[in-house]
């Protein structure tokens, strides 16, 4: 089977410099969703017709199995499909999809393809409570499709028809070339419409069959930011419903965004307004607090992530406790039972089993052993303005509050670092490290006061 995806439109109503089909839905271009669905049908040829912003669109979705045809002038859907003809296998049927209709299920398309076997012409239709603005499917007394009539050309009786054309079709490819060549542009837009092909197919004696989707929203397209937002919420609710079926507890299924792949174990609980991006895995008994953003991360069993935590490119072991207001950046690796608390940032660092950094700390480019306590206000000074250096803290170290560790530096096992200490040399095992200071108390001191006006 050939699949052609039309993606050449300008998208004027989007009011954006970005080509319409590249606007994101769930964090990925609209067109990428359509291509992924098309791939599940295992086409022999997959052709995307580009036009407006052609180079940008091609760069965004380029892949070995995707070919591109260019529609230099936007002269209608029929003209667009015609540009793809040289890339198609004439012995195979062709399914035509749209790059701005991202939610059509593969099962819906497969039913249409099955209905159109043996050289039939297939149309995906949908029945609407309010079909205003759409082309109507006109049938004869026996129920056979005779034509598609546009709203402006429909008679009062035809306007009562609730079954409408979605534009998605399956057609014999060998005949399609002839039918497209016979199209006329005698309409208000001066364009060649793919919908006109159905009458040519009927005149040529081809049986026209129809199929319908399970859900009306499968055929909704995007022509404005409002429609894009509507489809985003539909998609996210579908994702949420699937998570609920899998046993995930969602505090509010309407307030979760998954912009990638989210895999959850048993008894996972997710509070409101959480965003998951890229590939995220949550193991059994993970609890996510409200307003968290988690991207490309794995979270071990029994972990608790408190509210307003941001995690990006991190790996968390089992029974860790994170947040609230923590930030784990790429390369952060936490062993089992590690704690990273409020206003702590971890970047490209390993935190060992049972170690804790509970308050107001920056840990960057560091290797921290097991059972280490990092006091509030501790900073690993990892950057000299040009180069990054690592800090190594071995097992069972106690780091007092307001400590600076100037990398590269190693702190040996069992060391105690007093509060307010700056470490710039390696520290041997088991010692107390401190910067000796003198505390002075001056009697008779009078604090300055503001003069009253």
Swiss-Prot record:
Quick one: where's region Pyrophosphorylase?
1-225
| GO BP, sorted A to Z | cell morphogenesis; cell wall organization; lipid A biosynthetic process; peptidoglycan biosynthetic process; regulation of cell shape; UDP-N-acetylglucosamine biosynthetic process
Annotated region (N-acetyltransferase), positions in chain: 247-453
Q: Which residues bind Mg(2+)?
A: 100, 223
Active site annotated at which positions? 359 (proton acceptor)
Q: Name one Pfam family in it.
A: NTP_transf_3
Main localisation, per the record? cytoplasm
Kindly list the places in or outside the cell where this protein is found, as annotated in its UniProt entry.
Cytoplasm
Q: Which reaction(s) are listed as its catalytic activity?
A: alpha-D-glucosamine 1-phosphate + acetyl-CoA = N-acetyl-alpha-D-glucosamine 1-phosphate + CoA + H(+); N-acetyl-alpha-D-glucosamine 1-phosphate + UTP + H(+) = UDP-N-acetyl-alpha-D-glucosamine + diphosphate
Binding positions for acetyl-CoA?
376, 382-383, 401, 419
Q: Where does UDP-N-acetyl-alpha-D-glucosamine bind?
A: 6-9, 20, 71, 76-77, 98-100, 135, 150, 165, 223, 329, 347, 362, 373
GO cellular component terms listed in the entry, alphabetical order = cytoplasm; membrane
Instruction: Say which domain of life the source belongs to.
Output: Bacteria
Q: What pathway or pathways are given for this protein in its record?
A: Nucleotide-sugar biosynthesis; UDP-N-acetyl-alpha-D-glucosamine biosynthesis; N-acetyl-alpha-D-glucosamine 1-phosphate from alpha-D-glucosamine 6-phosphate (route II): step 2/2; Nucleotide-sugar biosynthesis; UDP-N-acetyl-alpha-D-glucosamine biosynthesis; UDP-N-acetyl-alpha-D-glucosamine from N-acetyl-alpha-D-glucosamine 1-phosphate: step 1/1; Bacterial outer membrane biogenesis; LPS lipid A biosynthesis
Q: What is its EC number?
A: 2.7.7.23, 2.3.1.157
On subunit structure and binding partners, the annotation says: Homotrimer.
Q: What does this protein do?
A: Catalyzes the last two sequential reactions in the de novo biosynthetic pathway for UDP-N-acetylglucosamine (UDP-GlcNAc). The C-terminal domain catalyzes the transfer of acetyl group from acetyl coenzyme A to glucosamine-1-phosphate (GlcN-1-P) to produce N-acetylglucosamine-1-phosphate (GlcNAc-1-P), which is converted into UDP-GlcNAc by the transfer of uridine 5-monophosphate (from uridine 5-triphosphate), a reaction catalyzed by the N-terminal domain.
- Spell out the protein name for this chain: Bifunctional protein GlmU
Organism per entry: Burkholderia cenocepacia (strain ATCC BAA-245 / DSM 16553 / LMG 16656 / NCTC 13227 / J2315 / CF5610)
